[in-house]
Amino acid sequence: MAMSVHIRRLSIADLESCLAVESAAFPPAEAASREKIEYRLVTCPELCYGLFLDSTSIAPSDAADVPQSATASTNASHQNARLIAHVLSTRSLSAVVTDQDMQLPANWRNNRDKPQDSAKVGQQPNGGTVALHSLAVSPSHQKLGLGKYLMSRYIEKMREMQAVERISILTYENLVSYYEELGFQLLGASASNHGGVAWKDMVYTIDTKSD
């Protein structure tokens, strides 16, 4: 029987699950720290989504474009669902993801009541770019098409948000074609050296023209 999955917005209650997925999916030098994940879940949960494996399996009629290994659940109980993939992002004023986007404002926990746009790093609420920091899939569920499924749904969610002009990512050279299949365009080598990796800048442009 195909596994049943659902996607929902993440919250701080998902911190431990996100940390487990992130740590399993990336090398230590590249994985987001616990504090960075916490910051993103607290500061901009509307930009963070998770793919959950349900405890029950159903086969709804609207699951045609879900990977063959999974069906999209519509009315199954999600009580015991397990996070198997996530997307974590912040807003940025830059057209591409920068090292400043990945940093944390000083004393951010104590300054949560202050306007976010006063910070020079991290979440920039007036930014038109969604800086995607992590598309992470649990290793035991990789190569099943689940990452692309989550990402395609995430793009739809971002289209529905106000003042989102683009989604930008840093990715490995060998994953450029993966993101091109999702509609991202390669801009070239990134100025970021996060984790000591030669990253590539890629951008998905959101069509803001009305129908």
Question: PLM ranges: what are they?
Answer:
Residues 202, 206-211:
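C-terminal helix/juxtamembrane-tail motif
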Residues 60-136, 140-142, 149-152, 157, ...:
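Conserved acyl-donor/pantetheine-binding loop and adjacent beta-alpha core of acyl/acetyltransferases
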Residues 132, 166-171:
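Conserved hydrophobic beta-strand within the GNAT/NAT acetyltransferase core sheet
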Residues 1-36, 43, 47-105:
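Short amphipathic alpha-helix that is part of the acyltransferase structural core
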Residues 46-48, 197-203:
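Short hydrophobic/aromatic beta-strand or adjacent loop that forms the aromatic wall/cage
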Residues 160-163, 172-197:
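Conserved active-site alpha-helix within GNAT-family acetyltransferase domains
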Residues 6, 164-167:
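Short active-site oxyanion
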